[in-house]
């Protein structure tokens, strides 16, 4: 479609050596929905990178695949333990993207409530930064 972005990824993760993170942040996207083939490779590495970059990460379980059901199950369980939200495409279609909890916002709200907001830090050139990527 006109205006759509095309990203060519050189490795398994869609974030590795691409501009995906920059594009998503500029568009204020905070949730990524993962689908595709070879769950243990492309889906899993993209999932871990998305979580590390503080995106709410959803894996549509019936829209990705592995060589065997056992490999698929184990990889999905591992991604869930890392923080991914697992759901099937019917559930996602029924509820839509607006129902995916904004985990980053919830963490920031709890930090403010508990007065545990991290202190800002200074870079070597004197600029002040907050640990929050958003």
Functional labels for PLM-detected ranges:
Residues 1-109, 119, 123, 129-133:
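Active-site-adjacent betaalpha module
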Residues 113:
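Major-groove DNA-recognition helix of helix-turn-helix-type DNA-binding domains
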């Amino acid at each position: 479609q006109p205006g759509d972005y095309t990203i060519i990824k050189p490795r398994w993760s869609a974030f590795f050596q691409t501009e995906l993170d920059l594009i998503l942040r500029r568009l204020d996207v905070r949730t990524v929905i993962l689908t595709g083939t070879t769950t243990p490779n492309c889906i899993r590495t993209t999932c871990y990178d998305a979580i590390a970059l503080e995106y709410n990460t959803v894996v549509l379980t019936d829209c990705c695949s592995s060589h065997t059901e056992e490999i698929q199950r184990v990889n999905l369980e591992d991604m869930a333990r890392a923080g991914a939200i697992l759901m099937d495409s019917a559930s996602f279609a029924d509820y839509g993207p607006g129902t995916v909890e904004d985990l980053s916002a919830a963490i920031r709200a709890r930090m403010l409530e508990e007065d545990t907001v991290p202190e800002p830090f200074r870079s070597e050139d004197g600029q002040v930064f907050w640990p929050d990527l958003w």
